[in-house]
Swiss-Prot record:
Catalyzes the transfer of the phosphoribosyl group of 5-phosphorylribose-1-pyrophosphate (PRPP) to anthranilate to yield N-(5'-phosphoribosyl)-anthranilate (PRA). It holds the Pfam family Glycos_trans_3N. Pathway: Amino-acid biosynthesis; L-tryptophan biosynthesis; L-tryptophan from chorismate: step 2/5. Disulfide bonds: none annotated. Belongs to the anthranilate phosphoribosyltransferase family. It comes from Stutzerimonas stutzeri (strain A1501) (Pseudomonas stutzeri). One of its GO terms (cellular component) is cytosol. This is Anthranilate phosphoribosyltransferase. Homodimer. One of its GO terms (biological process) is L-tryptophan biosynthetic process. The gene is trpD.
Amino acid sequence: MDIKEALNRIVGQLDLTTEEMQAVMRQIMTGQCTDAQVGAFLMGMRMKSETIDEIVGAVQVMRELAAPVRFDTDKLVDTCGTGGDGMNIFNVSTAASFVVAAAGGKVAKHGNRAVSGKSGSADLLEAAGVFLDLTPEQVARSVDTVGVGFMFAPAHHGAMKYAAGPRRELGLRTLFNILGPMANPAGVRHQVLGVFSKALCRPMAEVLSRLGSKHVLVVHAQDGLDEISLAAPTHVAELKDGEIREYSIQPEDFGIKSQSLIGLNVEDAQGSLALIRDALGRRKSENGQKAADMIVLNAGAALYAADVATTLKQGVEMAHDALCSGIARDKLEELVSFTAVFKQENQK
């Protein structure tokens, strides 16, 4: 099937099979389609709504064409969201990565610059001084030594360049917002995945189950956030041992007070970084303490997904201790220093 046939199908509200989606994605990601065709396909898929079969096929092609990062362990965890929630909250999942590492987890973080928001994970880390242009081997060394490694999506998904223009020009969430978090080049099988709609929670868990994931929490908060929220109940679809169960959680379940998100919005990466440094440090401001509470909730979920903690509650307790110890703040600075060495190596 070529993209013209696919466009005719989706305009008629007809779904593609997994194999048909794979064929179209290979055409897109090998530069065989025009920008107009790619843009039309992305908008058509959004208007039709992507099926599990379609998403599975698309992720398989992204993984197939990615530059892999190889590890000796399968206990790696990723924390990321689809974006597109329109909330412009600070980079919660990226901040949570340092708390997870401080508590003994290993984070293979996969991310990009902002598409529809104010600050993507790459924007934040770059603002902090983290060198992003790492080889796969350097990412692996970073995870082994620091506990956190960042895989800049464009460096590992070179074929994505063929969709970058249409995505940027559309400025809306598209199929790729859904695909990106599931196309981690390290092949992580433990994950906290935030999604922009409750309706996506179970389908994404089913997709990841078909793709071989072991323990995943797919989350969407009642206030619209693609993270575990401090301000509202969060719906969770948990994949564990091949079974999916759904439930709702709220901050009080973990001894944390529900609070509004006012003060957690940021205008850019520098604003996000300042709030995160306060949250991971001495929490001098009310917003810093509030951000810390939200980071702890999300880091706790990642520790549970990574099987470092045996329950979600234990994960949150471990995250709280790691943040309050100051080790999480040190992990951020350690990553900056560690990647600076790679920058010097790569410039020789």
